[in-house]
Amino acid sequence: MKRLKKTLHLSSLSLASQALSSAALAAAPVMLDQGKEWTESHRQDFYSRDQGSQVMPLPWLKALRQPDGTPFLADSLARYGYLPNPKAPAEGLPVGFTVAGTGARQMVGMTCSACHTRQIEVKGTAYRIDGGPAIVDFQAFLADLDRAVGPLTSDDAAFDAFAKQILGANPPPGARDALLAAVKEWYEPYHTLIERALPKDTWGPARLDAVSMIFNRLTGLDIGTAPPYLIPDNIKAADAPVRYPFLWNAARQNKTQWPGFAANGNDLLGLARNVGEVYGVFATFHPQKSKFHLLGMDYLKINSANFHGLGKLEDLIKKIGPPKWPWAVDKHLARKGALIFARKTDEGGCVECHGIRIKDLVLWDTPLRDVGSDSRQHAILDGQVQTGVMEGARMPFGQPLKATDGAFDVLAVAVAGSILQHFVPILGEKHDAKAAAVKPESVMTDETRQLLTAFQKPVRTQADPYPYESRVLQGIWAAAPYLHNGSVPTLEELLKPAAERVESFPVGSAYDVDKVGLAAQQTQFGSYVLKTTGCEQRDSGNSRCGHEYGTSLSAEEKRALLEYLKVL
């Protein structure tokens, strides 16, 4: 409890209560050109397409109050950086928040655009970048949701006011008690997650430890052997924050996720990446042992993942192009920058790691390199957990999970098992004992076999002990802060040696067109400042160390390279 209080005290909400003072963020933004395929109808679909996430019943969220008594949805969650959605599926929900179901069973969830829609501000004008890294404080949102629901479980007056909003002044007999039981049932796993997972040193805006939270949700809340399905000791501090990646061209990478552990290349592999994501973002998922299913598990009986919606979202993401720089460009200088970009790495160039490398007709080859940057995320990939109900579960051709096994392996088996059961009819059906003797390996196709390698830990070598993906840099101007952990505010700063980079900086929507990145003055999240560490603490999660390329270029060459990166 003490840890939760510290987390809440340090929560960025206290800072975010001053958020969005810029009128530009409330006005209609300029929608940037992101290619002919990206249309207004696609945008609206992307903003509210359900993927199976279930945060909370919609009537509850509408009735919920902040500590000062104002509705939790009063500002459409703008205090956390979420963006207004005039065409939201329910009043008060921002971009990326969804509604599924009907009536009292309507559930609010989150979808891709909550974390992958960016808005920046220059001279009083806001610019919208779809598929860009969100500038949101997700940890503050999580902590404050816990803070809002907690009193309902112990304070009669608070619960009575909440229940009246939902049930009316004269609810039928038993309705109040049933609602209280449902709230407590919701709160126990959620509070367990928040109390154990959220770190003392907050992620801050524009960053989150997504991989840890996926591991924590799945192994801590979902795979216990009986309701409430909890294995609290599996939940670890989510202390390896990264910046949200941009989505344009993501479907063309042959590997995704910052350490490059998720394979890409066909619809099933894209689905695997997205199913893992939705399990981490509030999907309801409780796999169960089943001797009547060929995989020995029933992954779909209690599973809210919307496979159709996830497929549609992947199709939408493929249509998002890199945003075009909306301000003036010195074309002559940019041409000089293009020549510098094309140099070899040891000459200050970028193309050897960040150029387009055609792998086949569909994919680009994505190099994995250790460039000396923060190593913390690799540590969490090796975490061990109790496997609970999934002990003995396996993928076709694979080894069964042990009682204690890797969180990474549990995720891989759960995701592959869910998709196989959904898409391969014989694996999704119940069978008698005779039919159950059929080996699941015998029904695998060349396509479904690829699921078996959908998640693979990156190969760590002596030369590259902590590798991360080197992405194509189209649209990189719109993705600050930089490095995988968001520890460098601008591209100009990234071209300096690590020892000379700023140690701390504010985070927000104000943009610097000259330095190409976050402006030095921010108001969106009050006085929040991200404090980084140097190379002496490479595993802190906040190290600004590494990627010392182009640092020896002349000042004129650096200006030229920055100008080119604006239009790349």
Regions found by a protein language model. Give the residues of each.
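Bacterial N-terminal signal peptides
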Residues: 11-22
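N-terminal secretory signal peptides that target proteins for export/translocation
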Residues: 1-6
